[in-house]
Swiss-Prot record:
Protein's name according to its UniProt entry: Ribonuclease Y
GO biological process: mRNA catabolic process
Source species taxonomy: Bacteria, Bacillati, Bacillota, Bacilli, Lactobacillales
Assigned protein family: Belongs to the RNase Y family.
Main localization of the protein described in the UniProt heading: membrane
One GO MF term attached to the UniProt entry: RNA binding
Region (Disordered): 81-136
Chain ranges of the KH domain: 213-276
Primary gene name: rny
Transmembrane intervals: 6-26
Amino acid sequence: MSSVTLVSITLAAVIALAVGLLIGFALQKKLHQNNLDRATQTAEGIIEAAKKEAATLKKEKLLEAKDENHRYRTQLEDELKDRRTEVQKSEHRLNQREDTLDRRDDTLDRKEQSLADREANLNKRQQQLDEREQDISSEISKQHTELERIAELTHEQARQQILDQTQSELTHERAVMIKESEDEAKEAADKKAKVLIADAIQRSASDIVAETTVTVVNLPNDDMKGRIIGREGRNIRTLETLTGIDLIIDDTPQAVVLSGFDPIRREIARIALEKLIQDGRIHPARIEEMVDKARKEMDDRIREIGEQAIFDVGIHNMHPDLIKILGRLHFRTSYGQNVLDHSIQVAKLTGVMAAELGEDVTLAKRAGLLHDIGKALDHEVDGSHVEIGVELATKYKEPKTVINAIASHHGDVEPTSVISVLVAAADAISAARPGARSESLENYLHRLEKLEAIANSHAGVDHSFAIQAGREVRVIVQPEKLSDDQSVILARDIRNEIEKELEYPGHIKVTVIRETRTVEYAK
């Protein structure tokens, strides 16, 4: 009984559960349907609202497009209006130009017609002149024939006679004019030059010491000579090879002589040798070390000398390499005169004269200091010291006035400024003053012979004499061959030839002597 009851209860429970599930499913479906209906209604509302909003937005965009289209059309109309106005103005200008061209065309036509008329008149006058010229030529020919008959001279003979007479008169007048002009120019120039040069010289004084090709190094004792020579002469050979200088060791007590034509190498050898003597250790390795130190010391010394030179002169802004080259001039000589001292003196003289003439004093000093800069390298580089100096000044971008002063101070080119002329004058003053330079006997004799040869090469010269150590040449002429006027021209020609062919310090006086003697004996 109990098992049947349990089954019944279980079955009832299952049925109740099934019925509950069916009822729950039905309720769930109903609820889902209601939610779906509400969602559908909401979606339809959203769609409807979107449609309304889209319609509104469409209307707004259409209105904006219409406004934009209206503005664009208005802008186009304004631009078209402006373009029409500009075109009208251009048409007006073109019309005006066309009218102007028409008027010019008319004017040219009138001028062309006028020129044609003038050409016709000129042709007519030319024809008349040709006819008249023929008549005159015929008349002149008749007159020539008549003159030849009367004068008993042909046309060529008369022409030659007139030319000879005219040439004689012109020669006399030219000689007189040359003498008067030279006298006036010399008088005025001498007065001004004497004032300038005297002032420049009295404000610039310097000592000039002649250099030689040898240097003497003192030794503490004669035993040092053997140490300098070294075993089998290896020390002296090493020193000579490294410096390029000859060491002369003779019987002179406590001294050795360094001989060489390059003063810089000779100075390097002197410094190295003195350091070796002071150190006491003399062997090839030590010699090489001391020579290297001497070269470095020499480079520093050259730079310091160059800097001191530009400081003494009072110039600045010079390229460092050019300053070192300038310092090398201290170890160069010209006819026994120290080139750097000479350059400093020229710079100061040029500056004084430039100040008197109102020129740029600093630029004048710069040109004077650098005028012989090429001599620092003329033994190492091909070319004259003038050419080398111009190349150096151009390389280091010196002013054009300085370059021209370097190029023209020996007369190789024409000076283009007053400063260039002053540099040449100062160079001559510094070189020509007594004691500044020495000259070899061979060169001196050659210059005297050349002076006399130049004078004797001219026609009408009897003989000549170079006197006063070559500062004057006296020319004796044959009076029957040369007149007084021709003597003036002869002196000028000899002067020009001397200036062209000879190099000399200062100036040379040319004196032409024409003497006529008449002797009669009373019996």
